[in-house]
Design a protein with these regions (language model features):
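Cofactor-binding beta-sheet edge motifs in enzyme active sites
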Residues: 1-310
Length: 310
């Protein structure tokens, strides 16, 4: 049986939706005093097995918080939906990375701190965080390695240099699939229109077995992440998907693709994942750059055409 693209997009599985509400505070010393994260999402696990409760995977790296803070509270409630759903590149990290790193940026500005310095301030190089999602996983999140990708990407991107009016630079990092990734995004916002000029990525995946293949994976993750953040949206009306082809469900085109730089942290540790970890920091780096350029916070994806015109 040969399906048309319209048939395929109308009857395929879709990326889960999620909603997050975060509140927090910083103290007089500029340290995070509290972080409360409430979220709900349409569970992948419960779609495939209705008798199975939403798995802890939906919480992802919220259960493996890299940033040191005095009080951290996490609440989750599964949301039911009749929309068929399944895995998408980087799974729950694709939206959790956006949420966590966007809010980390908001806390940095609330503290009057540089976003890079604020992140480093809360990453204790002597600290390792066990995997609460999978107790059998012997690979903890090593904060020193997260610091390493942040420092490398900042150095390569020229973090701290002054930009002209209407331009912004944002930073974000995330840990997934036992790998560490950080992005710096440079954007231009003019007359309510956004153009991403450059993405610099730094990744720590242990020993890089195939440099060309690994670099291609990160570059494609950037393009995937930008497509999802800036264009991809499925809307459901009368029980069916409205968008059924690429004229309505657009992908990032070649002339819209920014200059992409990829850098790897050199080490001789065991190789870890590379196909997905490059994606989660893309959207928050871009939207943090949008804030730097415009003073407007983007808290919903994808970014719609009118979001920056208001």
């Amino acid at each position: 049986v040969l399906w048309s693209r319209e048939d395929d997009m109308a009857h395929d599985f879709y990326r889960p939706a999620s909603y997050h509400r975060i509140s927090g505070a910083v103290d007089a010393q500029g340290q995070i005093a509290a972080w409360k994260h409430r979220s709900t999402s349409t569970s992948i696990a419960s779609w495939w097995d209705r008798a199975k409760p939403a798995e802890s995977q939906e919480l992802g790296s919220t259960l493996q918080m890299p940033y040191l803070m005095k009080n951290y509270k996490l609440e989750y409630a599964p949301a039911d939906s009749g929309v068929p759903r399944a895995w998408w590149r980087s799974v729950e990290a694709s939206f959790i990375g956006f949420v966590m790193e966007s809010y980390m940026d908001e806390l940095a500005h609330a503290a009057g701190a540089d976003p890079l310095e604020f992140r480093l301030r809360h990453l204790d190089p002597a600290r390792a965080v066990a995997n609460a999602v999978d107790p059998k996983d012997s690979n903890p999140l090593v904060c020193a390695r997260m610091r390493g990708v942040l420092q490398l990407v900042a150095s390569k991107a020229g973090w701290g240099s002054k930009l002209p009016a209407g331009q912004g630079r944002g930073i974000a990092c995330h840990y997934s699939f036992n790998s560490y990734a950080a992005n710096v995004a440079d954007v231009i916002v003019e007359n309510g229109k956004l153009r991403v000029e450059r993405i610099v990525s730094a990744v720590d995946i242990g020993t890089v077995v195939s440099p060309d293949g690994a670099r291609a994976q990160v570059e494609s993750a950037v393009i995937y992440g930008l497509t999802a953040a800036l264009k991809s949206q499925i809307t459901i009306q009368n029980g069916r998907a409205v968008e059924t082809n690429f004229n309505h469900f657009a992908c990032l085109k070649m002339d819209e693709t920014p200059h992409i730089e990829v850098h790897f942290v050199p080490n001789d540790l065991a190789p870890t994942g590379i196909g997905e970890p490059g994606l989660p920091p893309v959207a928050p780096a871009v939207m943090n750059a949008v804030f730097a350029a415009t003073g407007k916070r983007v808290r919903r994806l994808p970014l719609l055409p009118d979001d920056l015109r208001a």
